[in-house]
Amino acid sequence: ISSQHLCGSHLVEALNLVCGDRGFFYNPRGIVEQCCHRPCSIFELENYCN
């Protein structure tokens, strides 16, 4: 799966899909920098799961 730019509600939806029941730690500054301003991968998204 390729890296993608994910912003706003798309980013939250992606975190819900990747993290599922684990939930996630939402730190807007860090994740927006990593996944919205630059493309990020599913593996990078998993870093934000609880």
Swiss-Prot record:
Keywords: Carbohydrate metabolism, Disulfide bond, Glucose metabolism, Hormone, Secreted
Major location (coarse): secreted
Gene Ontology MF annotations: hormone activity
Keyword DNA-binding: no
Domain of life of the native organism: Eukaryota
Disulfide bonds: 7-36, 19-49, 35-40
GO cellular component: extracellular space
Family matches, as Pfam families: Insulin
GO biological process: glucose metabolic process
Subcellular location: Secreted
SUPFAM superfamilies documented for this protein: Insulin-like
Record's function text: Insulin decreases blood glucose concentration. It increases cell permeability to monosaccharides, amino acids and fatty acids. It accelerates glycolysis, the pentose phosphate cycle, and glycogen synthesis in liver.
Family to which the UniProt record says this protein belongs: Belongs to the insulin family.
Subunit organization: Heterodimer of a B chain and an A chain linked by two disulfide bonds.
UniProt name for this protein: Insulin-1
Organism: Katsuwonus pelamis
